Amino acid sequence: MKPDEPTWTPPPGAHTAAAADRPPAEVRRILRLFHPYRGRLAVVGLLVGASSLVSVASPFLLREILDTAIPQGRTGLLTLLALGMILTAVMTSVFGVLQTLISTTVGQRVMHDLRTAVYTQLQRMPLAFFTRTRTGEVQSRIANDIGGMQATVTSTATSLVSNLTAVIATVVAMLALDWRLTVVSLLLLPVFVAISRRVGRERKRITTQRQKQMAAMAATVTESLSVSGILLGRTMGRSDSLTQGFAEESERLVDLEVRSSMAGRWRMSTIGIVMAAMPAVIYWAAGLTFASGAAAVSIGTLVAFVTLQQGLFRPAVSLLSTGVQMQTSLALFQRIFEYLDLTVDITEPEKPVRLEKIRGEIAFEDVDFSYDEKSGPTLTGIDVTVPAGSSLAVVGSTGSGKSTLSYLVPRLYDVTGGRVTLDGVDVRDLDFDTLARAVGVVSQETYLFHASVADNLRFAKPDATEEEIEAAARAAQIHDHIASLPDGYDTLVGERGYRFSGGEKQRLAIARTILRDPPVLILDEATSALDTRTEQAVQQAIDALSAGRTTLTIAHRLSTVRDADQIVVLEDGRAAERGTHEELLDRDGRYAALIHRDSHPAPVPAP
């Protein structure tokens, strides 16, 4: 990370009071996620409606059994009514299974769409985003936040429709039986709704805090349990300290998990107790009407009504809990939408230019660059042309903008002034495929996947044959070493290639780039971290790679750039000098001073 780069923060307003007006819009946005599956959801709706209608029929059949079939001794009618009750139970179960199958499939497809959308968005984000964001934070958004939505998108939405339909159908049936008892049953419903909404808001707030803590813990795990993190922790004797730090992070998560689980639990339990006690209230109310001489309620009607009321209890409580769950899930959706709403600064033009044949001429035309408006300029007025097939070396002190300049060519960053061209075309006008085919990068920090040697090389060219892979490895002078391994090209390289030495990893990276065969090559201090003997072997591989290509070399060791066609010396983001090695030495300026520094390093003071 560059010292003048600001730390990335999520877009403001997602978790503030100012966001109070956002939930309706966010709910509409969530509903749009289900739009591609509206046909299947319509089938679910039909199944839900059919299930609700069938389920409320059973109490009416029960009433007829108690008020007609049994008192009148009509055994035939009794048999038919009993079979009807059995049939309603079977139909309700079948409808429920089909409903669960379809809704779960739709929910999992929505989860897949969300994960893919977030990953695609992150793939499009500029390099600056990843230099400012902890890897664990990114992983947590995809794993924990989207994973936390699973219950909502797979069952909560369907549960909401199912329970709402069941409640409406049951209330209508209760009104048909006795409107007075129905009014008594529903008197406290507004209070219950108000309580559930308050509990939902409380859980949403705690869920936001919990997900942030989970992201922080994931970042800690990613950093400290990587190969580099383990090596650093053990060699510095800080393993116990890291363990203690993780335990503290985990302890904070424990507190938030308990608070999230218990938020509003007593209030929701009170609702459950009251609703469970309602049958007793109904029996009491029916008894009062009978004792007062008012229109009596038949035993069959009373039993059917209480059966409906008990049937109302489960979907009503579930409906209130679903409301709480949806409020909680809004916090997760907000965190995902933060990523989906990030501005992608580097985009492909509407009508991009595609170069079929790339010569490789690179030109920096009065280029300015800064990471943002608050930081000062990193590059100012860079003006240099690199003819196709020639080499340019960029040297200078640490922080002078060398790597940044090279990253403007493949559009890892975009210029803030001037332009960079490839074969006379502004790189911002080219399609991404042209840039990917045109430019290959070999950097000091070689990245290898935890896969086989062959798979790592094929990342550059998925359809490469074994002969092409071996030829690239030979050119990079790494074939003999690979062939000496027990598994050869099937050898797993380990996380980030830690089963290979630094020089071996560099040569694997060079072989991968050779396989890609780009006309433009960027060497970003590719040998600066190697010992002299390894550097010589890698340099030979680089020489083979560079032959006939336009090459931009970012150099720390000036001995590697003496043969460059052009050398540019950057100082404070400006091109202080330009020329060949001999020309710059004759000027006895900044380049000559750097050469002298490399040849006569300052003595280290004695302790």
Model-derived segments and spans:
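Transmembrane helices of ABC transporter permease
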Residues: 36, 40-53, 155-209, 283-297, ...
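Juxtamembrane helix-loop junctions of ABC transporter transmembrane domains
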Residues: 15-23, 46-47, 54-63, 67, ...
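Membrane-integrated ABC transporters
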Residues: 1-55, 70, 74-81, 99-103, ...
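Cytoplasmic coupling helices
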Residues: 101-120, 158-162, 185-226, 240, ...
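Transmembrane helix-loop-helix hairpins at lipid-water interfaces of multipass membrane proteins
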Residues: 41-95, 102, 175-182, 280, ...
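Helix-loop-helix
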Residues: 70-79, 173-187, 263-334, 339-340
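ABC-type nucleotide-binding domain
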Residues: 348-349, 355-607
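An intracellular "coupling" helix at the cytosolic face of ABC transporter transmembrane type-1 domains
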Residues: 31, 35, 39, 127-128, ...
